[in-house]
Amino acid sequence: MCIRDSSSFIFGWAPVVDGDVLPAQPFDPQAPEMSKDIPVMMGTTLHEFTSSTYMPGLRNISKEDAIKMVRQRYGDRADDFLAAFAKAYPDYQPKDLLDTDFIFRPSTLEQGRLKAVQQGAPVYMYMFAWESPVMDGMLRSTHCMEIPFVFNNVVRHASMTGGGAEACALGEKMSSAWLNFARTGNPNAEGLPQWDTFTKENGALMYFDNQCEMKYNHDKELIDIIRTFPTRGF
C-alpha cells in the first residue's frame, strides 16, 4: 500500500496498482475472472461516517440549515438531490441529508453490478439501517455497526448496540443469514423476507432494521446524482 495521490478517496490514501503486490485493479474494468463462480455478499451501513456524531451542531439541525448545506455541496443539482433523497428516504430527518453515506454505497453498488453481469455466481446486497440507542442515539447506523449483529455478539457489545430485545432479535436473524451464506452461498434465513439476488437491473438489497425488508433500486436516482460529484464529505 502506497501513498502517492493525495486526492485518492476521502482519507487521502489508497492501494496503488504496482504490478507486484497488486498486479491489477480488482474491479476495473470488470470483476475478476478467477472468482467468477464464487458467490458474494456485500453491503454498507446507512450512515457510515455519521457526520453528526463528530459535528454536534448537526444533531438537531433545522431542515432549512440542512438544505442550505446541501445547496453548498451540490450547487445547481441541489433540487435534484433533495427530490431524489425524499424519494429514497421519504421519512427522513434533516440530519439524514448530511449523515447518509455516499462514500461506500456508490462503489459497493458498482462492484456488485460488475460481479452480477458476469453471471457466474449470485450477488447478495444489503444495507444496515438499524440505529443504535446508545449515547442518546448519537452513533446511528455508523461504520461497522452491523458487525456485532453478524456474529450475534449483540449483548457482549452492548456498549455499541444497547443490548436490548430489538437488537438481540435482529442479531439472531442476521447471524443466521451470514452462517447460511458461509455454508451454502445463500443467505436466506428464517425470520427474514426472501432475499433475492442482486442484478444490475433490479438493484435488490436486504434492508436490515427492526422491520427487515427487500428494496429494489430504492436509491438509484440519488446515487446517479452522487456519482457526478467527487467523493468527499461535507
Region spans (language model):
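Substrate-gating cap/lid region and adjacent catalytic-acid/histidine neighborhood
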Residues: 4-166, 177
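Mature extracytoplasmic/periplasmic domains
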Residues: 112, 179, 188-215
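Acidic/polar loop patches that form or flank catalytic/metal-binding clefts of enzymes
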Residues: 121-126, 187-193
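A structural signal for short secondary-structure junctions
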Residues: 142, 172, 198-200
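Non-catalytic, well-ordered alpha-helical segments in soluble enzyme domains
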Residues: 167-190
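Tryptophan-rich aromatic "cage" segments
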Residues: 211-234
